[in-house]
Amino acid sequence: MPRLRRVSRLLLAVGLAAGSATCGTDDLTRESPDGLRPDLAAGPPERLAITRQPPGSALDQEVWEPGRQPTVVVRDGAGVKVPGAVVTASIAGGGGSLQGSLTKTTNANGIAAFTDLGIAGAGTHTLRFSAGTAGVTSSSLVLNPLPPEAQTGKWDPPVPWDIVPLHLSLMPTGKLLGWGKYEPDGRMGMPRLWNPSAGPPTGASMIHADTMLFCAGHALMADGRLMVSGGHKDDDRGLDVTNIFDPVTESWIGGLPRMAKGRWYPTVTTLADGRLVTVAGRDTTSTVVLVPEIWEGGRWVELPGASLRLPYYPRQFLAPNGKVFYAGERVQARWLDVDAVTAKGRGRWSTSSSLVHLWPFNRDYGSAVMYDTGRILVVGGGGDLNWSTPDPRSSTPTATAETIDLNGSGPRWSATDQMHFPRRHLNATVLPDGKVLVTGGTSSGGFNTMAGAVRAAEAWDPETGRWTLLASNAVDRVYHSVSLLLPDGTVLHGASGDANVPNTAQRYPREPSHEVFRPPYLFRGTRPTVTGLSKTVVTWGERFNVSTPNAAQITRVRWIRLGSVTHAFDTNQRANTLAFSVGSGVVKVTVPNNSRRAPPGHYVLFLLNRNGVPSTGTIVQVR
């Protein structure tokens, strides 16, 4: 008799097989315990059971963790598991909108595993899972409203330093190297190396430097060392020294070749091949330095063909065409080709009537950031009537912002929304979710009017072009303030002052402290988790794997170059949105295809879900 039932079931299965086209090759080769292929043994779906319920509680719109995503088993009328059945999820009760991939196909064991569900709409809900005419309803799920911080972010209380860290760089080791002008007792300021995971920065290791690094330029080199160009001889007078900090030995490298000229307030930019170019500043006699110098072969080489007067700390970036793009603070933008040869020698600046900002006045002490490949946001600045070509309509800074796209045949300018506050001495920091955070600064005219200090942060969204007002910090941070993205996705905003009021013996208030801003995305549910990388040193065009249980939930991958910031400009910061594909438990990431888009060095890699919630960052080197 058992043999007869078995033959009957086989004949029935053969009849059903002609209409089945939903199972894969792997399913056709698997066998059930009684030796029958499950796709041939099963009839149409008639019974569904939830083998893992949705979470009992979650946040509104949260993408539920992989271990809390529902799974459903599908059986036919005889209790045989049905592979290849399409299961659809929907809201059964409580209203709201179900988000994520709403249909899943059962595997060879008849299991449909959902991967990225979430519900928009606070309250109590139930879900319905259906396959054919069969269905099952989940247990209740309570969705709690998002906290206010999911819209505004949140500031941690101020944390003291022994110095004012108005120069600050994130090292590939995860430590922060910072320095100011003075020690608390008035002596020459010495750098501090701080490990954020080891406690507060008070008492952080002092890394002795032989020269005063205040008002130098700096950028991270391709190998992760920090190049520091110039320094402070006196106000408006720069040093010709070169200092390189090694984060592995945690020491300065001595005996390096000097520059041809001293530099006070220069900008250092890392090029596509790892060379560095330093421009602008004032020399030991307070004369404006016209000729750039390039660091190559372990020494500085002048570029006399590129002689040009530029403002302090020029806002410039390596562009996708391999040249350096000068984006301000002056109205006229320019290109620098370090390898061109002219009648005056090596190097050449070029410009045209079309390379002009939309805002027709100088943005002194405004900020700029490359928020994605070849795309720059220029924001704020101006307001000092003692500065050249001030805005005659106003003695206050501007709230305007504009974008520059360097990806085409020529730069393209576009106007974007204005900030909620005019600002100078602001900092612009690119975030993992693609937005740009602006912190600090003053809204009043004059060089550094403390009465106009702005504590409210705001964020610009490149997808909408709009600014969102965020939470306010506790301390006024204006001239000499800094902001820096940390690998955990928070932003350190610190320093201010530690300098003399121009043309007086008075000093601005010192702020030897920092505050940490936790952006809104950190209050929108559980973060994706990274469990490992196939490699942490990659090259251009290469693919590498990021292991994560959240692979099916990842909608965006970005990396952001380690920051090195001072005087309202992060010379090292730039971001790329990376191509990727998803496998089982893995995200396969593709590195940009050339070093003009992603210059050699270290980046913090983030995986993001559809709500813009990032993983904790992982530092990756491209070379």
Give, region by region, the residue ranges found by the protein language model.
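Short, acidic Ser/Thr/Gly-rich low-complexity loop/linker segments typical of extracellular
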Residues: 100-111
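Kelch-like beta-propeller repeat domains
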Residues: 144-623
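C-terminal motif of bacterial Sec signal peptides marking the signal peptidase cleavage site
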Residues: 19-22
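Extracellular/surface recognition and adhesion modules
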Residues: 50, 72, 89, 110, ...
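Bacterial signal peptide processing site
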Residues: 24-27
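Short S/T/G/P-enriched beta-strand
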Residues: 30-83, 93-98, 124, 132-147
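Exposed beta-strand face motif in extracellular beta-rich ectodomains
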Residues: 123-127, 601-603
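Bacterial N-terminal signal peptides that target proteins for export
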Residues: 1-11
